[in-house]
Amino acid sequence: MAARSVRLAQLLLFTLLCGFVGLSAAKHLDLDGIHHHQHHLHSATTHHRRRLQRDSRAKDAVGGSTHQCDAVKSYFESIDIKSSGTYSEKGAICGGNCCNNATELELRDKAAGMFEQLLHHHTSSLRGVLETNAKQFQSHVLELAQISENMTHSLFSKVYTRMVPSSRMMIHQLYTEIMNHLIYTSNYTNSNGQLGRRGIGSVQSNLEEAVRHFFVQLFPVAYHQMVHLSKNNLGDLHEDYVNCLQHNFDEMHPFGDIPQQVQSNLGKSVHMSNVFMNALLQAAEVLSEADALYGEQLTDTCKLHLLKMHYCPNCNGHHSSSRSETKLCYGYCKNVMRGCSAEYAGLLDSPWSGVVDSLNNLVTTHILSDTGIINVIKHLQTYFSEAIMAAMHNGPELEKKVKKTCGTPSLTPYSSGEPDARPPPHKNNVKWATDPDPGMVLFLSTIDKSKEFYTTIVDNFCDEQQHSRDDHSCWSGDRFGDYTQLLINPGTDSQRYNPEVPFNAKAQTGKLNELVDKLFKIRKSIGAAAPSNSIQATHDIQNDMGEGSGGGEGQIGDDEEEYGGAHGSGDGSGDGPHTPIEESEGTTTNEVESRDSGKTSGSNPLEGTATWMLLTLVTMLFSSCS
């Protein structure tokens, strides 16, 4: 009985425990349900309140956008862009309510047109400088030649009066020949190899022959009127005697070395003048041909960023009349403009710089030197006078040579009457034209500034516009803020890492390579005409040709990683380097889920203790029962 009573008591205790545990579990489940229901009601209320706030803000934004877009609409109409104000469809590029996709397409074309116009303007200006200087230089040396002829006639009429009737025509013929060789329109060889009446290579030899012919003709006149003087020296020399003197001109050497000096100096200086004018015109042609290619070199990426730079602020409701609202980031502007011009600038920059260096050397060492065309023309009448004086000084020796070779002079009556010993009336002293040195100095200054023309052709735009130099609080392509991308230097190698418009190494550059070859030929023609600098010029040209047409696009070496910081995504957002959000170490989805379930099962420590006590009692009960 005692054992039975014990078992009965144990059974009752077990029943009571089970009931207690059941009640506790039921109570716990009811509390969880209440908490879950209350959480659901709170979430629904919060979601409803947020939706009302969002709808209210959207309503306010629509009203504000409508007002802003109305202001932008008038600006668009002023630049011939049709706009209906606010669009329900936002443009894919700018993302503003004031432009749809069609508007953005129009604005993109207009931005590209503005860029081309900028290039046309600067190219046309430089081309005009080259063409104008070629014409002004030609005009000046022709004027000098005409004045020199007048001064020579005046000299003969004052000093060598008896020679005037016979020498007037030969002097005029010589100067006519000189001026014909200085007219570049007849000597010009364009960059396509098409010749005028003569190529400049024949100018020097033809002119030297004309100078020699002048002195050969002058010899009988100078000998008869200034050397072989006598009372019976009346009349003209017989034609046969004149022919004898002219035929033996080289052996008699009447004027010393002066004819050879004039031949050399005049021939070389006129040749250099033609080379100079020819180079100016060919360089202007290259600029003109490059000007026609600008539009073909604009990539879609370039056009996209030109749109973002010029008009996306307007599409987002910022009126262009307010400079503070549309102020561009200086670094962003430079990167876009340099990236858009990198293809032709990278190819043409070095060859163009070489041409400018050669032109500078040609002007300073040949055109403006003591043996340059200006000084040579100014001293022609002095050369002629010195030649006659040399013949007179060596008169006795010269007469011996003449009598030995041609005999005693044979005379004929004057064909046009006896020459008047009195000097003919002449105009007031002839003055030289304005010295061209100031104009040439200005030209040299201008052409020297154009040495990096293709590198800096677009920088002027960013320098002239209203920009934020420190790249703070400005338009960075997608928003107003700070522009944190690196400003990439000009040059093909650097522009590969342009964060906005990266250099396109696969672009078609066939026509540009043709222009590179033309620039090399211009520099080579200048170098060939200036042999004193031929070694250095040849070395420089060979170096340039290694970078010019036909060359590869180059290899990126181990320093590619060094430029990694500059190699941005190209989105132009100006947000700076992107730091990806990484998950905490050791944190996975599964672990997040297990932690959530742990919160439910172990949120109350008393429940864990009761469960442990219950399991202990049940174990004891089953042990007793067994």
Curated annotation (Swiss-Prot):
Glycans are attached at N97, N101, N150, N187, S549, S569, S573, S601. InterPro entries: Glypican. Residues 565-575 have a biased composition (Gly residues). It comes from the Eukaryota. Residues 41-65, 533-607 are annotated as: Disordered. Residues 41-52 have a biased composition (Basic residues). One of its GO terms (biological process) is positive regulation of smoothened signaling pathway. Residues 1-26 form the signal peptide. Changing S549A: Lack of heparan sulfate glycosaminoglycan modification. Does not affect binding to nord. The keyword Repeat does not apply. Residues 603-626 form a propeptide. Interacts with nord; the interaction promotes dally degradation. Interacts with Magu. As part of the dally/ Magu complex, associates with fwe (isoforms ubi, LoseA and LoseB) and is unable to interact with fwe independently of Magu. Cell surface proteoglycan that bears heparan sulfate. Functions as a coreceptor for growth factors and morphogens, such as the products of dpp, to regulate signaling and distribution of these ligands. Required for cell division patterning during postembryonic development of the nervous system. Plays a role in dpp/BMP signaling possibly by stabilizing dpp and thereby creating a morphological gradient during wing development. Might have a role in testis development. PANTHER family: DIVISION ABNORMALLY DELAYED PROTEIN, GLYPICAN. Belongs to the glypican family. This is Division abnormally delayed protein. It comes from Drosophila melanogaster (Fruit fly).
